[in-house]
Amino acid sequence: VYDAAAERLTKVRREAAVRFAKAVTNEMQTLSMKGGRFEVNLVPIPRSEVGVEKCEFLMAGHPGVDVSPLAKVASGGELSRIGLAIFTLTSRNTSVPTLIFDEVDSGVGGATGEVVGRMMKQLGQTRQVLCVTHLPQVAACGDHHLKVEKVSDGIETVSYLRELNPTQRVE
């Protein structure tokens, strides 16, 4: 019984992996990773309650580069943008109440910043999204803005967080 169930699960995973990889690869093209590729590798594991394989995410950030494990080759900004793409693609099927993105726009320009901002705004329709950003294109998509200010007296540095009013948001 287990072997038959595991075989069915593997078949479903293979089919889903192809669709998911194609969707993430498409999102990468709009997130300043032109020519990049995303793949899902099914890695055999000993029999367990989750089947006989686990999923490994692979990526190539540029054309002509072989795919490698995502965790080993992605920069912080690439990892954040791929995470954003994955959350956007899976948001209908997950119930994560809060997402936090730290400089997801790192290393990108204005046009990509607009795409990133729109994707986060879409996610924000069904959950809370917090984002640390320096790009006005990303910030413009937010509903509320907080400013982090650091103050130093020469001995110690203290950070303050304050909510911005509509006038302060455009400064």
Regions found by a protein language model. Give the residues of each.
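Charged, surface-exposed helical/loop "interaction arms" that form contiguous linear patches used
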Residues: 1-46
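Conserved D-loop-proximal element of ABC-family nucleotide-binding domains
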Residues: 18, 106-114
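Flexible glycine-/small-residue-rich
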Residues: 40-44, 59-63, 84-88, 150, ...
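C-terminal lobe/lid and adjacent interdomain/linker elements of RecA-like ASCE P-loop ATPase modules
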Residues: 55, 111-171
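GG-anchored amphipathic helix commonly corresponding to the ABC/SMC/Rad50 NBD signature/C-loop
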Residues: 57, 61-64, 77-99, 123
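Walker B catalytic acidic pair
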Residues: 102-103
